[in-house]
């Protein structure tokens, strides 16, 4: 897919947010609604307690979860307003390589499940030198993060 000028702008903003991450793999995410950015974030080490569904049983906070969490709390738990907003929201998900360029940024299984649960309208990401735009309900992945794989292996010891 070739990004429009507006999509290119949003994806660039997402990539800029990825550079703020202190993690080994730097991910960023921008949420847009009505052509405007409504939330932005990047992946971080988890440094707070879990009081919501976005951070339970996790050692880090993914960029997508950071953004969904911000939208959720922005609406003060007003479910009707959240549902209406999420149904019209597009997430631009990026990953910044060591040389500063965009690299594979498809959401992991856990993030995709949360994106689907919150009825996000579209996701845009970079994979194998191409950009993709999907309705999250039409997208499937088996991608697990290194952290998830490590935690799974620990539970089998």
Q: Where do the protein language model's features map onto the residues?
A:
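Intrinsic disorder/low-structure terminal segments
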Residues: 9-10, 32, 145
């Amino acid at each position: 897919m070739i990004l429009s000028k507006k999509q290119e702008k949003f994806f660039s903003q997402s990539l800029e947010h990825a550079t703020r991450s202190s993690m080994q793999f730097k991910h960023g995410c921008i949420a847009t609604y009505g052509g405007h950015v409504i939330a932005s974030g990047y992946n971080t080490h988890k440094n707070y307690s879990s009081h919501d569904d976005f951070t339970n049983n996790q050692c880090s906070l993914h960029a997508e979860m950071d953004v969904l969490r911000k939208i959720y709390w922005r609406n003060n738990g007003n479910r009707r307003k959240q549902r209406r907003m999420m149904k019209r929201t597009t997430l631009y998900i990026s990953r910044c390589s060591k040389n500063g360029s965009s690299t594979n940024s498809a959401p992991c299984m856990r993030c995709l499940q949360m994106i689907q649960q919150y009825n996000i309208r579209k996701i845009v990401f970079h994979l194998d030198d191409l950009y993709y735009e999907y309705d999250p309900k039409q997208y499937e992945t088996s991608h697990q993060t290194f952290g998830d794989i490590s935690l799974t292996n620990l539970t089998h010891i």
